[in-house]
Protein backbone atom coordinates (compact mmCIF):
# COMPACT_ATOMS: atom_id res chain seq x y z
CA UNK A 1 0.00 0.00 0.00
CA UNK A 2 1.43 3.34 -1.00
CA UNK A 3 2.10 6.07 1.51
CA UNK A 4 -0.49 8.22 -0.26
CA UNK A 5 -3.16 5.53 0.10
CA UNK A 6 -2.31 5.04 3.78
CA UNK A 7 -2.66 8.75 4.41
CA UNK A 8 -6.00 8.79 2.60
CA UNK A 9 -7.31 5.84 4.64
CA UNK A 10 -6.09 7.44 7.85
CA UNK A 11 -7.84 10.67 6.94
CA UNK A 12 -11.08 8.83 6.18
CA UNK A 13 -10.86 6.93 9.48
CA UNK A 14 -10.19 10.14 11.39
CA UNK A 15 -13.08 11.86 9.61
CA UNK A 16 -15.44 9.03 10.49
CA UNK A 17 -14.29 9.08 14.12
CA UNK A 18 -14.82 12.83 14.29
CA UNK A 19 -18.32 12.42 12.84
CA UNK A 20 -19.06 9.65 15.32
CA UNK A 21 -17.97 11.76 18.29
CA UNK A 22 -19.73 14.83 16.90
CA UNK A 23 -23.07 13.11 16.52
CA UNK A 24 -22.65 11.31 19.84
CA UNK A 25 -22.08 14.59 21.68
CA UNK A 26 -24.78 16.28 19.64
CA UNK A 27 -27.24 13.60 20.77
CA UNK A 28 -26.18 14.05 24.41
CA UNK A 29 -26.47 17.83 24.07
CA UNK A 30 -29.95 17.68 22.55
CA UNK A 31 -31.07 15.12 25.13
CA UNK A 32 -29.80 17.28 27.99
CA UNK A 33 -31.28 20.41 26.43
CA UNK A 34 -34.66 18.71 26.21
CA UNK A 35 -34.34 17.61 29.85
CA UNK A 36 -33.40 21.13 30.96
CA UNK A 37 -36.28 22.64 29.01
CA UNK A 38 -38.72 20.23 30.63
CA UNK A 39 -37.30 20.96 34.07
CA UNK A 40 -37.49 24.69 33.41
CA UNK A 41 -41.13 24.31 32.43
CA UNK A 42 -41.82 22.32 35.60
CA UNK A 43 -40.19 25.05 37.68
CA UNK A 44 -42.28 27.70 35.92
CA UNK A 45 -45.45 25.73 36.55
CA UNK A 46 -44.54 25.14 40.18
CA UNK A 47 -44.43 28.91 40.67
CA UNK A 48 -48.23 28.87 40.54
CA UNK A 49 -49.26 27.55 43.94
CA UNK A 50 -51.84 28.48 46.54
CA UNK A 51 -52.09 27.61 50.21
CA UNK A 52 -55.47 26.00 50.86
CA UNK A 53 -56.08 25.29 54.51
CA UNK A 54 -52.42 24.57 55.12
CA UNK A 55 -52.07 22.41 51.99
CA UNK A 56 -49.98 23.66 49.09
CA UNK A 57 -51.91 23.22 45.83
CA UNK A 58 -49.79 23.43 42.69
CA UNK A 59 -50.90 23.89 39.11
CA UNK A 60 -48.56 21.49 37.34
CA UNK A 61 -51.85 20.18 36.05
CA UNK A 62 -54.96 22.37 35.74
CA UNK A 63 -57.73 22.01 38.31
CA UNK A 64 -61.47 21.65 37.78
CA UNK A 65 -63.89 23.69 39.88
CA UNK A 66 -67.42 22.27 39.91
CA UNK A 67 -70.34 24.67 40.33
CA UNK A 68 -72.99 24.20 43.02
CA UNK A 69 -75.70 26.87 42.87
CA UNK A 70 -78.04 26.86 45.85
CA UNK A 71 -80.28 29.34 44.06
CA UNK A 72 -83.70 29.19 42.38
CA UNK A 73 -82.73 31.47 39.49
CA UNK A 74 -79.22 30.82 38.15
CA UNK A 75 -79.01 31.20 34.36
CA UNK A 76 -78.52 27.46 33.74
CA UNK A 77 -81.49 25.59 35.16
CA UNK A 78 -79.50 22.37 35.42
CA UNK A 79 -77.23 23.96 38.02
CA UNK A 80 -79.97 24.97 40.46
CA UNK A 81 -79.95 22.77 43.56
CA UNK A 82 -82.28 23.53 46.47
CA UNK A 83 -83.52 20.37 48.16
CA UNK A 84 -81.32 18.41 50.53
CA UNK A 85 -81.12 15.49 48.10
CA UNK A 86 -80.28 17.71 45.12
CA UNK A 87 -77.47 19.42 47.01
CA UNK A 88 -76.08 16.17 48.40
CA UNK A 89 -76.19 14.46 45.01
CA UNK A 90 -74.47 17.40 43.33
CA UNK A 91 -71.64 17.52 45.92
CA UNK A 92 -71.02 13.80 45.55
CA UNK A 93 -71.19 14.02 41.76
CA UNK A 94 -68.54 16.75 41.58
CA UNK A 95 -66.13 14.72 43.70
CA UNK A 96 -66.90 11.40 41.98
CA UNK A 97 -66.27 12.90 38.54
CA UNK A 98 -62.85 14.22 39.54
CA UNK A 99 -63.55 17.81 40.55
CA UNK A 100 -60.84 19.45 42.63
CA UNK A 101 -62.89 22.32 44.09
CA UNK A 102 -66.61 22.82 44.81
CA UNK A 103 -67.71 26.42 44.20
CA UNK A 104 -70.89 27.27 46.11
CA UNK A 105 -72.98 30.30 45.18
CA UNK A 106 -76.24 31.64 46.60
CA UNK A 107 -76.64 34.87 44.62
CA UNK A 108 -77.39 34.73 40.91
CA UNK A 109 -75.41 37.20 38.79
CA UNK A 110 -77.40 36.62 35.60
CA UNK A 111 -78.75 39.80 33.95
CA UNK A 112 -82.10 40.76 35.44
CA UNK A 113 -81.79 38.49 38.47
CA UNK A 114 -83.67 39.85 41.51
CA UNK A 115 -81.70 41.33 44.38
CA UNK A 116 -81.05 38.92 47.24
CA UNK A 117 -80.55 40.27 50.74
CA UNK A 118 -77.44 39.42 52.69
CA UNK A 119 -79.54 37.52 55.22
CA UNK A 120 -81.13 35.40 52.47
CA UNK A 121 -77.75 34.71 50.87
CA UNK A 122 -76.38 33.57 54.24
CA UNK A 123 -79.39 31.33 54.90
CA UNK A 124 -79.05 29.63 51.53
CA UNK A 125 -75.33 29.14 52.01
CA UNK A 126 -75.65 27.77 55.54
CA UNK A 127 -78.12 25.20 54.30
CA UNK A 128 -75.99 24.22 51.32
CA UNK A 129 -72.65 24.21 53.14
CA UNK A 130 -73.95 22.12 56.03
CA UNK A 131 -75.10 19.44 53.57
CA UNK A 132 -71.85 19.69 51.62
CA UNK A 133 -69.73 19.23 54.75
CA UNK A 134 -71.81 16.25 55.81
CA UNK A 135 -71.39 14.58 52.42
CA UNK A 136 -67.84 15.66 51.57
CA UNK A 137 -66.07 16.81 54.75
CA UNK A 138 -62.62 16.91 53.11
CA UNK A 139 -63.58 18.74 49.92
CA UNK A 140 -61.86 21.99 48.99
CA UNK A 141 -64.68 24.54 48.87
CA UNK A 142 -64.88 28.06 47.50
CA UNK A 143 -67.69 30.52 48.15
CA UNK A 144 -69.00 32.65 45.30
CA UNK A 145 -69.84 35.96 46.98
CA UNK A 146 -69.00 39.65 46.84
CA UNK A 147 -70.11 40.36 50.43
CA UNK A 148 -67.42 40.47 53.15
CA UNK A 149 -69.64 39.22 55.99
CA UNK A 150 -70.94 36.34 53.88
CA UNK A 151 -67.36 35.36 53.09
CA UNK A 152 -66.46 35.48 56.78
CA UNK A 153 -69.41 33.28 57.74
CA UNK A 154 -68.53 30.69 55.10
CA UNK A 155 -64.87 30.54 56.07
CA UNK A 156 -65.24 30.65 59.85
CA UNK A 157 -68.31 28.44 60.22
CA UNK A 158 -67.80 25.90 57.42
CA UNK A 159 -64.10 25.91 56.66
CA UNK A 160 -64.48 27.31 53.16
CA UNK A 161 -60.99 27.62 51.69
CA UNK A 162 -61.34 30.16 48.83
CA UNK A 163 -63.31 33.38 48.31
CA UNK A 164 -64.50 33.75 44.71
CA UNK A 165 -65.56 37.37 44.18
CA UNK A 166 -67.21 38.45 40.91
CA UNK A 167 -67.32 42.15 41.84
CA UNK A 168 -63.60 42.90 41.41
CA UNK A 169 -63.48 43.86 45.06
CA UNK A 170 -66.68 45.89 44.83
CA UNK A 171 -64.78 48.34 42.62
CA UNK A 172 -66.91 47.63 39.56
CA UNK A 173 -70.47 47.61 40.90
CA UNK A 174 -71.42 44.33 39.17
CA UNK A 175 -75.06 44.04 38.06
CA UNK A 176 -77.33 44.91 41.00
CA UNK A 177 -74.52 45.12 43.50
CA UNK A 178 -73.67 48.51 45.05
CA UNK A 179 -70.17 49.91 45.08
CA UNK A 180 -68.44 49.67 48.48
CA UNK A 181 -65.15 51.21 47.36
CA UNK A 182 -63.89 54.78 47.22
CA UNK A 183 -60.73 56.06 45.59
CA UNK A 184 -57.83 55.85 48.01
CA UNK A 185 -59.45 53.17 50.18
CA UNK A 186 -59.02 49.42 50.23
CA UNK A 187 -62.15 47.50 49.22
CA UNK A 188 -63.93 45.89 52.17
CA UNK A 189 -63.76 42.42 50.64
CA UNK A 190 -59.98 42.83 50.20
CA UNK A 191 -59.62 43.64 53.88
CA UNK A 192 -61.85 40.73 54.85
CA UNK A 193 -59.87 38.24 52.76
CA UNK A 194 -56.66 39.54 54.33
CA UNK A 195 -58.21 38.98 57.77
CA UNK A 196 -59.40 35.47 56.86
CA UNK A 197 -56.07 34.51 55.26
CA UNK A 198 -57.60 32.52 52.42
CA UNK A 199 -56.95 32.50 48.66
CA UNK A 200 -58.95 35.06 46.69
CA UNK A 201 -60.32 34.95 43.14
CA UNK A 202 -60.12 38.44 41.62
CA UNK A 203 -62.44 38.79 38.64
CA UNK A 204 -62.40 41.61 36.09
CA UNK A 205 -65.22 43.21 34.12
CA UNK A 206 -62.82 45.23 31.98
CA UNK A 207 -63.65 44.75 28.27
CA UNK A 208 -60.14 44.32 26.90
CA UNK A 209 -56.79 42.87 27.89
CA UNK A 210 -54.99 46.22 28.13
CA UNK A 211 -57.44 47.71 30.64
CA UNK A 212 -57.59 44.40 32.46
CA UNK A 213 -53.82 44.17 32.91
CA UNK A 214 -53.63 47.72 34.24
CA UNK A 215 -56.49 47.16 36.68
CA UNK A 216 -55.24 43.76 37.81
CA UNK A 217 -51.75 45.13 38.47
CA UNK A 218 -53.20 47.87 40.70
CA UNK A 219 -55.64 45.57 42.49
CA UNK A 220 -53.06 42.84 43.05
CA UNK A 221 -50.76 45.42 44.60
CA UNK A 222 -53.56 46.52 46.96
CA UNK A 223 -54.07 42.91 48.00
CA UNK A 224 -50.34 42.44 48.49
CA UNK A 225 -50.23 45.58 50.63
CA UNK A 226 -52.85 44.00 52.89
CA UNK A 227 -50.90 40.75 53.12
CA UNK A 228 -52.97 38.60 50.74
CA UNK A 229 -50.52 36.18 49.16
CA UNK A 230 -52.71 33.71 47.28
CA UNK A 231 -54.47 35.45 44.40
CA UNK A 232 -56.19 33.83 41.41
CA UNK A 233 -57.10 35.92 38.36
CA UNK A 234 -60.40 35.55 36.50
CA UNK A 235 -60.83 37.54 33.25
CA UNK A 236 -64.59 37.52 33.78
CA UNK A 237 -66.04 36.14 30.58
CA UNK A 238 -69.64 37.30 30.22
CA UNK A 239 -69.25 40.20 32.66
CA UNK A 240 -69.21 43.71 31.18
CA UNK A 241 -68.20 42.47 27.74
CA UNK A 242 -69.88 42.21 24.35
CA UNK A 243 -69.92 38.96 22.41
CA UNK A 244 -67.05 40.18 20.24
CA UNK A 245 -65.05 41.39 23.25
CA UNK A 246 -65.40 37.98 24.90
CA UNK A 247 -63.84 36.23 21.90
CA UNK A 248 -61.08 38.79 21.43
CA UNK A 249 -60.26 38.34 25.11
CA UNK A 250 -60.25 34.54 24.79
CA UNK A 251 -57.61 34.88 22.10
CA UNK A 252 -55.43 36.99 24.41
CA UNK A 253 -55.80 35.55 27.91
CA UNK A 254 -52.27 34.14 27.81
CA UNK A 255 -51.08 37.75 28.24
CA UNK A 256 -52.41 37.67 31.81
CA UNK A 257 -49.68 35.14 32.66
CA UNK A 258 -47.22 38.04 32.80
CA UNK A 259 -48.62 38.71 36.30
CA UNK A 260 -47.38 35.26 37.37
CA UNK A 261 -50.62 34.27 39.09
CA UNK A 262 -52.95 31.29 38.55
CA UNK A 263 -55.64 31.90 35.93
CA UNK A 264 -59.26 30.80 36.35
CA UNK A 265 -61.57 30.63 33.33
CA UNK A 266 -65.34 30.32 33.66
CA UNK A 267 -67.18 30.08 30.34
CA UNK A 268 -69.41 27.11 31.14
CA UNK A 269 -72.65 27.25 29.10
CA UNK A 270 -72.50 31.06 28.95
CA UNK A 271 -74.24 33.28 26.41
CA UNK A 272 -71.00 33.87 24.50
CA UNK A 273 -71.42 30.25 23.37
CA UNK A 274 -75.11 29.93 22.63
CA UNK A 275 -75.52 33.41 21.14
CA UNK A 276 -72.82 32.57 18.62
CA UNK A 277 -74.09 29.08 17.81
CA UNK A 278 -77.81 29.66 18.26
CA UNK A 279 -79.26 27.79 21.19
CA UNK A 280 -79.45 28.09 24.95
CA UNK A 281 -77.48 27.03 28.04
CA UNK A 282 -78.85 23.49 27.83
CA UNK A 283 -77.42 22.97 24.33
CA UNK A 284 -74.01 24.53 25.05
CA UNK A 285 -71.97 21.64 26.44
CA UNK A 286 -70.02 21.02 23.23
CA UNK A 287 -69.19 24.71 22.85
CA UNK A 288 -68.10 24.78 26.48
CA UNK A 289 -65.66 21.91 25.91
CA UNK A 290 -64.23 23.65 22.85
CA UNK A 291 -63.60 26.90 24.72
CA UNK A 292 -62.23 25.02 27.73
CA UNK A 293 -59.74 23.40 25.36
CA UNK A 294 -58.71 26.79 23.98
CA UNK A 295 -58.40 28.14 27.52
CA UNK A 296 -56.09 25.31 28.59
CA UNK A 297 -53.90 25.75 25.53
CA UNK A 298 -53.59 29.43 26.43
CA UNK A 299 -52.58 28.75 30.02
CA UNK A 300 -55.72 28.38 32.16
CA UNK A 301 -54.99 26.81 35.55
CA UNK A 302 -58.58 26.36 36.78
CA UNK A 303 -61.73 25.59 34.79
CA UNK A 304 -64.96 26.61 36.53
CA UNK A 305 -67.67 24.35 35.09
CA UNK A 306 -71.11 22.84 35.42
CA UNK A 307 -70.01 19.62 33.69
CA UNK A 308 -67.13 18.20 35.71
CA UNK A 309 -66.62 14.88 33.92
CA UNK A 310 -66.26 16.54 30.53
CA UNK A 311 -63.88 19.17 31.91
CA UNK A 312 -61.66 16.55 33.57
CA UNK A 313 -61.48 14.66 30.28
CA UNK A 314 -60.58 17.88 28.47
CA UNK A 315 -57.76 18.53 30.94
CA UNK A 316 -56.38 15.03 30.43
CA UNK A 317 -56.47 15.18 26.64
CA UNK A 318 -54.96 18.67 26.38
CA UNK A 319 -52.30 17.66 28.88
CA UNK A 320 -51.35 14.67 26.77
CA UNK A 321 -51.16 16.85 23.64
CA UNK A 322 -48.88 19.28 25.49
CA UNK A 323 -46.75 16.43 26.77
CA UNK A 324 -47.59 17.06 30.41
CA UNK A 325 -47.72 14.36 33.05
CA UNK A 326 -51.04 15.20 34.62
CA UNK A 327 -51.98 14.40 38.16
CA UNK A 328 -55.74 14.42 37.73
CA UNK A 329 -58.07 12.35 39.86
CA UNK A 330 -59.92 9.60 38.01
Model-derived segments and spans:
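Catalytic domains of carbohydrate-active enzymes, especially glycoside hydrolases
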Residues: 89-105
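Short polybasic linear motifs
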Residues: 5-6, 26, 325-329
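Active-site-adjacent loop and "lid" segments of alpha/beta metabolic enzymes
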Residues: 52-53, 76-93, 109-127, 131-134, ...
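N-terminal amphipathic alpha-helix/helix-capping segment at the start of soluble metabolic enzymes
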Residues: 42-71, 323-326
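Structural motif
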Residues: 62-65, 230, 262
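Short, positively charged and aromatic/hydrophobic N-terminal segments
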Residues: 9-15, 21-22, 28-38, 42
Amino acid sequence: MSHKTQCKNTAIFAYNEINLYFFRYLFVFVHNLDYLCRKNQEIKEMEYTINVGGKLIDFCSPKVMGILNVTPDSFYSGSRKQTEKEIADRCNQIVAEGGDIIDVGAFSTRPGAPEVSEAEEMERLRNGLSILRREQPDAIVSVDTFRPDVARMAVEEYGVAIVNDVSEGGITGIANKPLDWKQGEYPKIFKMVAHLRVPYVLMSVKPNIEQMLMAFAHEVQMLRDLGVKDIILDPGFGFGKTLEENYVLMNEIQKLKVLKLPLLVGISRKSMIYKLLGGNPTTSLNGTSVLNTVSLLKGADILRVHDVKEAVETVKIVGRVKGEELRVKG
